[in-house]
Amino acid sequence: MYVEIMQESLDYIEENLKCEITAQELCDRAGFSLFHYYRLFHTAVGMPVMQYILRRRLLHAIYEIGQGEKMIEVALAYGFETHAGFYKAFVRGPRDEQKVRLQDVHDRGYIYKNGE
């Protein structure tokens, strides 16, 4: 049951990366309190929900920039208010253990339906 709920949340996040997503919105969709949702999400994914959303936005933005899109347009599309805000989020990056955990979740196919 929890796996399906978390997968639905991850799918929703992935489909709405260019929109504002709040933790309250996600926990309401999942039917859990904010506290319980935070715990479930962190256990399933290995990082807090808002940090996960930021990482996914960064990865998508980097991909689009690599495809020739203008950096400022991509940054704004993914909710970064300024070029500087995007750069700061990009430079900060995930800690090594979070990179390993995120890659592990991705390798198991848990995050993406379409294997993206």
Which role does the model predict for each range below?
Residues E25-L34, Y38:
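Helix-turn-helix
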Residues Y2, K88-E116:
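…primarily DNA-binding HTH/wHTH and HhH modules…
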Residues L34-F35, T82-A84:
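The DNA-contacting recognition helix of HTH DNA-binding domains
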Residues A30, Y78-G79:
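Core residues of bacterial helix-turn-helix
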